[in-house]
Amino acid sequence: MNITYPPIKKEEIDTIYAFCKKLIDDYEDLGSIDYDKVLAWVKRKIEKRADEYKRVLMGGDLAGFYRFHEEDGEMEIDDLYILPEYRGMGIGTKVLEKCLYDTDKTVFFYVFTKNERAIKLYKSLGFTERKKVGDTRIIMAQSGRG
């Protein structure tokens, strides 16, 4: 499996935003948030931090995106999204393993509690639940291996 992780292209910001919006639409309790405010924040974050995002290419074809950055002395995986047609192929696992091996710091991320498939994967890779955030998300973490 030939997977590479080049930086995103500026014109992909809107695509990443659309993926993030889909995750919010699919898994967030929309009645409990200010939807427009959340989406505006997501858009600003992606635009401001675009240099921290990576493309996930499988054999040169776009399979997904993610952001890996330092946050309070730890490393956060943010906005990990694998395109539906590439799910179940081990690509998400490879991204997570790459992040773990790229650092010796603790790696963490937020995941929606309704995203049971992702949580099952994360637990199988040794991530544990650190903290519940509101009613819809949890933080999962694991020590880096770098």
Language model: regions and residue ranges:
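Conserved N-terminal entry element of GNAT/NAT acetyltransferase domains
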Residues: 1-14, 144-146
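Acetyl-CoA-dependent GNAT
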Residues: 7-79, 83-84, 98, 131-134
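Alpha-helical interaction/dimerization surfaces of two-component signaling modules
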Residues: 19-23, 102, 121, 125
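Active-site acidic-Proline motif in GNAT/NAT acetyltransferases
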Residues: 83-85, 89, 113-114
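Conserved acetyl-CoA pyrophosphate-binding loop and the N-cap/start of the following alpha-helix
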Residues: 86, 90-98
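Conserved active-site alpha-helix within GNAT-family acetyltransferase domains
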Residues: 93, 114-131
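Conserved beta-strand-loop-alpha-helix junction that forms the acyl-donor binding cleft
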Residues: 108-119, 135-145
